[in-house]
């Protein structure tokens, strides 16, 4: 083995040891979403509505106790990525913040005062990593099915899957790395939701029907 190859082998070994050392304990993360200050989305173009949000956990039962796996330098799972807040609550709070930032009001379903009802089936909220030779590729994913109903007659106005994905490269995967990609996936999901043509058309329909009542 020449000197250059030997150095590469040593560096790869050190990298593997470093990754392994960081992977032995559970990671605790606090994902969340805060609307960008001073910025509104296309949701603001819709007349203010009273909206009820329901989020149901439809994730794979084998993933419901965590939001990711930590791995050692050889790709073996060694610990869990645990969220301090239930993922359904994280998504509910994010949607609530986005609607309120765009002049809409969130109401409880049982109050029966909603102009529109938004039902979310959370399919996956996950952080993952792929180990390459000298870096780690971190990935966050949020998959959900959405349904928008008229709050008065429960008529379905939109139904579709939506996704938010975020990737970044790092040298080491500490707790902040997992939280970062989970936040990124949540941000991308909310961004996609608030700009989706079907979502906007459904809410505009509700606003028009409200004006006629």
What are these regions (language model features)?
Residues 90-101:
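Amphipathic alpha-helical segments
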Residues 23-38, 102-157, 167-169:
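Surface-exposed short loop/turn segments
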Residues 54-60, 121-127, 163-165:
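Generic short beta-strand segments
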Residues 10-20:
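Bacterial N-terminal signal peptides
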Residues 1-10:
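Bacterial N-terminal signal peptides that target proteins for export
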Residues 22-89, 198-213:
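A structural "domain/chain start" motif
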Residues 72-86, 152-199:
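Short secondary-structure boundary motifs at beta->alpha junctions and helix caps
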């Amino acid at each position: 083995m020449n000197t250059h190859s030997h150095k590469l082998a040593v560096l790869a070994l050190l990298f593997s040891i470093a990754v392994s050392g960081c992977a032995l304990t559970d990671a605790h993360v606090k994902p969340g979403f805060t609307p960008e200050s001073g910025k509104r989305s296309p949701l603001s173009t819709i007349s203010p509505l009273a909206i009820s949000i329901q989020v149901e956990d439809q994730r794979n039962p084998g993933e419901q106790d965590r939001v990711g796996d930590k791995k050692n330098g050889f790709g073996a799972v060694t610990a869990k990525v645990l969220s301090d807040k239930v993922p359904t609550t994280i998504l509910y709070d994010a949607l609530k913040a986005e609607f309120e930032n765009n002049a809409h009001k969130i109401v409880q379903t049982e109050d029966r005062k909603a102009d529109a009802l938004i039902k979310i089936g959370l399919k996956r909220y996950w952080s993952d990593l792929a180990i390459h030779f000298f870096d780690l590729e971190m990935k966050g994913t949020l998959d959900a099915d959405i349904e928008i109903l008229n709050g008065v007659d429960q008529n379905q106005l939109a139904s579709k899957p939506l996704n938010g994905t975020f990737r970044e490269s790092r040298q080491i995967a500490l707790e902040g790395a997992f939280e970062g990609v989970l936040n990124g996936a949540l941000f991308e999901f909310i961004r996609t939701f608030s700009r989706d043509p079907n979502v906007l058309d459904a809410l505009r329909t509700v606003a028009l029907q409200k004006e006629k009542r």
